[in-house]
């Protein structure tokens, strides 16, 4: 049970009904259905993902420049002496300023510590989920192509895409 209703948790092996557990909402419950949750809590931001109970520092595989990978690992070690949780450095770190990555890392580690240290009991929301705007800013890091010339819809196939949406699949 959550403050917003019943939840559905996969992988419940070893749990008994009524056991309390820290979970993270992973989606929206359809009308009449339970809210999907997982017990593996992640703290995502633009540059890092903090993974409690999954130690290690990992750099996104899409960052192929070995020098940049080493620089990113140095940012983590220079920012945090003893890393208490696992950390994934996201692909957006490749072109980001090191200071921005360090600030983001400290913010996410602080949030993780705050949530994980809560010793309350009963259903409780420990933090707000990200807004759609923040989700977009976090996950869409490539610069947008803005077309303002006449004929832009035709040049980029917008009308064809709209027509495709009108037909049944």
Ranges and model annotations:
Residues 1-169:
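DE-rich acidic low-complexity regions and acidic surface loops
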């Amino acid at each position: 049970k959550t403050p917003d209703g019943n939840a559905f948790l996969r992988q419940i092996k070893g749990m008994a009904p009524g056991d309390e557990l820290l979970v993270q909402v992973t989606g929206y419950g359809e009308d009449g259905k339970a809210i999907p949750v997982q017990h593996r809590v992640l703290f995502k931001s633009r540059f890092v993902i903090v993974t409690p109970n999954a130690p290690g520092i990992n750099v996104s595989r899409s960052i192929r420049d070995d020098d940049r990978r080493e620089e990113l690992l140095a940012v983590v070690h220079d920012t945090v002496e003893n890393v208490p949780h696992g950390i994934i450095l996201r692909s957006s770190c490749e072109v980001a300023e090191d200071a921005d990555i360090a600030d983001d890392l400290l913010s996410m580690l602080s949030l993780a510590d705050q949530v994980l240290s809560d010793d309350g009991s009963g259903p409780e929301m420990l933090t707000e989920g990200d807004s759609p705007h923040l989700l977009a800013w976090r996950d869409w890091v490539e610069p947008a192509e803005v077309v303002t010339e006449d004929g832009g819809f035709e040049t980029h196939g917008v009308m064809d895409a709209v027509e495709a949406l009108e037909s049944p699949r």
